Amino acid sequence: MAAHDKDDPLLPAPHTHAPASPGRRAFMAFAGVSAGATLLATGRAAVAAESMFPFSSAPGGQPPAQPGHPFASDPIWGPGGEATGIIRRLAHIKPEMFSHADFHVTSYGARTLPASALISSTAWPSGKIPWVTGGTEQTAHPTNDLQSPGSNVMVPCDYTGTQYDSCAAFNAAIMDANRAGGGRVVVPAGNWYCGGPIVLLSHVNFHLESGCTIYFSPNPADYAKNGPYRTANGNLYHTRWQANDCLNFGSPIYAFHQTNIAVTADDNTCVLNGQAMTPIQPSTQAPTSCWWTFKGSSNEYGCAGSSTPSQAYLNPNNVALTSLPASQILNPQANVSFTNQYGTTTTLMDLLTGTGWNEDQNYLPALSELRVPVEDRVFGNGHYLRPCMIEFIGCTNVLLQHYHTQNTPFWQHHPTDCTNVVIDGVFADSVGPNNDGFDPDACNYVLVQNVQFNTGDDCIAMKSGKYLDTGYGPMQNIVVQDCTMQSGHGGLTIGSELSAGVQNVYARNLTMQNENWASNPLNIALRFKTNMNRGGFIKNVWINGVTLPNGVNLAGKYGGGALGAAISKITGTGTTGLATNPSTGQGGLIAFDCDYSPSGDAVRWTPSVISNINITNVNASNVSGAVSYSMPSGFVAGSNSCFQALVMQGSEAVDYNGPLPVPTVSPISGVTISNCNLGSPVCTGAAPTTPSTSASAAPGPIFVSNVSGIALSNVVIAGTTYNTTLTASAT
């Protein structure tokens, strides 16, 4: 068990995380299935698209309240609407909430870097960097072509602990500001180096002045030196990795159980560079790996397969699950035998100790599923779970404003169990593996506005814990408005880790520009994803106004598929053609996937519930021209907006591998899509009369499986207007 340093001045006593029981989670998942029926009948889709956003530039995005305005009676965006209430609640989250006292980091010994410290990625002193200077990595991930200028400048870890390492000065200024009752810690223009986490404390605004760039150490060991948990793997921090709690490397910017905290900047010339593409090794050594190597993708960022340590390959430092002390395994079902629907007698432990249990990316979820206490889920040195760039846990009144993130190790922003969060005017610009832009996790009351996204994964992804780590409750009450998306997997995504549920989501005026459409396109515009491991629910979602001038990815891809079952599906409505490869992974404009990569999870015991989803005014244009990525066999990109327009894959009972009886697997229901023009998909085949796996049976523009009563109203696809209801059984 890790020892917590109670005298550490940077952090309070540890938070005791008590994951919700499966019974509690099931109750939360099913308690509100029918909620929102009244709102569904309000006829909001009739609001004209051109009048949707007349007030988007108003302070806080608040609408005018004049009588007779088209939004005056709108239950979502009107003066008394649900989304408007969230915006007004968060109006006080701004720089003015902090004391006017300034604490200049130069007064604490911070020094700007000499010009010689900044090295071009093509001029590493001890030799070429394989993933930057050429080869398959550069072809597959042309990072320097996709990110903004400056992303290919590196500062080696040689500067950690030198006179140019400003980490101690930054944290000393933060501590002084906190002790003084609050204030603004100011980092002036210039290039700075930080050899470890910046730990924010209550009532402190960490502020970057115009022209400021902070280069964070690329060496993982520098994030396991000063945390409050003393372990054999370093001095670690309470973190959350892919929605499972653990002790791990600290994030470059971190806070735990603080109130009134902020990271702000004068403008987007202020850069927080996580240096995830910079070699871990000092400049005197040949470069062999970086933070992004830890992803474990062969032939990318220096990963040569299983011989390269990463999250995706066997880690000998992981103790066998069957050898864990009995006192750590708190799940009473761990070794209870049961017979599953396939007639196999097994146990939870048997499922968890199958192939791949000793990979870090599987070991942490296994510890969670065994209910091992968080203080015994120890990673850090000797392990390969990358930290988020900015991670705040259990904080209240959080402001993120106007800076620019680059080269982040993992997710760019990860507020967890936070209340009252505003992210405004940030440029989330990092295209490495798992570089999601903004991932609020089990937060309550969140406003995302005026944010630009250029990411290596989902631009926005809403989370609420994975499997048993649901003690923080659902992700709820979030407004997303006036944002721009470029590259990424999903523009606006809910999931996949949503075991405690996601509810009350309001989004409007999103421009999914997708300017890199020919080389690194946005894969999906609106993405809802979960599976029988995540379970959870998605309900009460209102999306109004999404523009896609360059469509999305024109190549279809599925993200796994139902285990042991064909994924081909037709419906009796004639609106969908055969899809042997429905585009839930990429290529679908609007994609629901309740069967997301099931083979990646050893335990699949909880179906998901989706209800009351309202999508209107989504408009996608076609693009014409060559693409640099591969199209599926037999398909050629012409003048198209996507591969398939609408893909809805419900949960599949065949995936369930828990004790009998098999639980009820509800279809996706309560979804209304209206007043949309989804352009011309690559797939426009007519529905075949019988299921077929023939290559000549082209998929249609719509794919549905295990859905009920999906209402399409004035939805135009390839010139055809759909006013119909879609219902289809499971595969």
Q: Positions of the model-derived regions?
A:
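Outer-membrane beta-barrel domain signature
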Residues: 160, 377-379, 436-437, 469-470, ...
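Short, T/G/N/S-enriched strand-turn elements that build extracellular solenoid repeat scaffolds
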Residues: 174-176, 193-201, 411-417, 450, ...
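Residue-level signal for WD-repeat beta-propeller blades
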Residues: 21, 179, 200, 208, ...
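Gly/Ser/Thr/Ala-enriched C-terminal appendages of enzymes
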Residues: 533-722
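Extracellular "leader-to-stem" segments immediately downstream of a signal peptide or signal-anchor
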Residues: 2-16, 23-197, 201-205, 209-393, ...
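Right-handed parallel beta-helix
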Residues: 210-211, 259-270, 396-406, 419-430, ...
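Short glycine/acidic-rich loop motifs that flank beta-strands on beta-rich extracellular proteins
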Residues: 194-197, 217-219, 275-279, 408-415, ...
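Active-site beta-loop-alpha junctions enriched in small/polar residues
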Residues: 465, 495-497, 531, 595
